[in-house]
Structures are given as C-alpha cells and as structure tokens.
C-alpha cells in the first residue's frame, strides 16, 4: 500500500470525523448497516492507535491494524476486508488523502 499524503481536507472547524463519515455515506446512499459497520471499524482503528487522528496516520498504521486483526484477532478474510474497505473509504472519500 503506498504511503498517504500528509495534507488532509480537514480544517479545525470541520465536523467531527464520524459525522463526516456518516454524511459522506448518506450522500452516496450506503445502507445503514454498512454505515454502522464502517463507523465501528473506524472507531476501532482510532482506539487501536491510542486515539490518534487518522489524518496523522497513514499506510503503515493501516497495515499494523489489519495485521493485528488477522494475527491477534483471528478474524476471517471477509471481516478483514470489511475493515480495509472502511479505512479506504475514510482515507479516500472523507479525508481525501488517497
């Protein structure tokens, strides 16, 4: 995974991160279940990295989280893929960093 650029489209007065995620998902007509799953994975990602903002993280931290899920969490490939899709949505569509 290539490293992500360090200039996110987030300003100090921007709405809270998960609100931004939900708004983008609703604009694109994602199902409520997908919205819930993605926001849960994003929360878990942030908590895994001790509440660091995703804009301050990049591909290395995403890889660490996904590896942790596979090795320590022993999640299935489809579960790991769902977490990856949630993080891809966050970085590409919300933070506009990918």
Predicted regions and their residues:
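N-terminal core-binding DNA-recognition domain of tyrosine recombinases/integrases
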Residues: 1-9, 19-33, 39-98
């Amino acid at each position: 995974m290539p490293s992500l650029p360090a200039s996110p489209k987030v300003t100090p007065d921007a709405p809270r991160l998960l609100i931004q995620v939900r708004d983008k998902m609703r604009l694109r007509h994602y199902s409520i279940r997908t919205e819930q799953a993605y926001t849960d994975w994003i929360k878990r990602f942030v908590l895994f990295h001790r509440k660091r903002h995703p804009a301050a993280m990049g591909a290395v931290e995403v890889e660490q989280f996904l590896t942790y899920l596979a090795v320590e969490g022993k999640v299935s490939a489809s579960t790991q893929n769902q977490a990856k899709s949630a993080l891809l949505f966050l970085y590409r569509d919300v933070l506009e960093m990918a």
